[in-house]
A protein has these predicted regions:
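Short linear motifs at protein or domain termini
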Residues: 1-98, 214-217
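C-terminal effector-binding regulatory domain of bacterial HTH transcription factors
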Residues: 1-4, 195-217
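A short secondary-structure junction motif
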Residues: 20, 24, 63, 115-118, ...
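Alpha-helix N-cap/N′ positions at the starts of helices
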Residues: 65, 88, 110, 177-180
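Conserved amphipathic alpha-helical segments that form helical-bundle/coiled-coil interaction surfaces
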Residues: 102-167, 180-188, 196-207
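Active-site loop of classical SDR/Rossmann-like NAD(P)-dependent oxidoreductases
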Residues: 173-175
């Protein structure tokens, strides 16, 4: 599903800025000038200009005339995107149940085992690892659907929710619940039970939406 290719400097800058905006490093309403970003990132203004243009096309930035203004993702945006995910991801899971491979199931199993390891690991905060493994599970689900359209659409929605997802899984009780929901989805996929996979995924996303709705923006 994913291709390995050389990433240009403009692509690297785009991905870095997108990640920084979606994780909250740059706040909504903050102005990002080419000069400032050139100094911060240590690159010329040409790839920055290209990256900013692409971020404006993604509606993550807007042009104010004095620089690019961070639009980011609001709580309302997040809830709207979850309404889309609730329906689409259930359908993707239903499709995945019919065509998921043993290798993809094994990758899911390994991801869930690691997720459990970090949730149960005592000591310092492991929210970043748990969030990344949560993303990995969902990416595998999208890939397993066998549909490029589902994969690209759902991957984009999932990525744009980064800040809210991290805040949600930082709550240990929600991280535990989410893992149990992932396990139920995995078991349905293992049985190639499309309707069960759809229903478990639907419930998982409704619970995740309700949890995120309680997160302070």
């Amino acid at each position: 599903m994913r291709e390995h290719k050389t990433i240009s400097i403009a692509d690297q800058i785009f991905e870095q800025l997108e990640r920084d905006i979606l994780t909250g490093k740059y706040q909504r309403g903050e102005v990002l000038s080419e000069m400032r970003l050139s100094a911060e990132l240590g690159v010329s203004r040409t790839p920055i200009r290209e990256a900013l243009r692409r971020l404006e096309q993604e509606n993550i930035l807007s042009d104010s005339g004095r620089g690019a203004v961070v639009v980011g993702i609001s709580r309302e945006d997040m809830l709207d995107m979850y309404e889309m995910r609730i329906q689409l991801e259930g359908l993707a899971a239903q499709r995945a149940a019919a065509c998921i491979s043993d290798q993809q199931l094994q990758q899911m199993r390994e991801t869930l085992d690691l997720q459990r390891f970090y949730i149960e690991k005592p000591g310092s905060d492991h929210a970043d690892q748990i969030k990344d493994l949560d993303s990995r599970f969902h990416q595998l689900l999208y890939e397993s659907s066998g549909s490029k359209a589902f994969y690209e659409t759902l991957s984009s929605l999932h990525k744009k929710m980064t800040k809210f997802r991290k805040a949600s899984v930082s709550r240990h009780s929600r991280a535990v619940e989410s893992l149990a929901e992932h396990e139920a989805i995995y078991e349905a996929l293992s049985r190639h039970d499309g309707e069960a996979a759809r229903q478990f995924t639907l419930c998982h996303n409704i619970n995740a939406r309700d949890s995120m709705a309680r997160v302070e923006e």
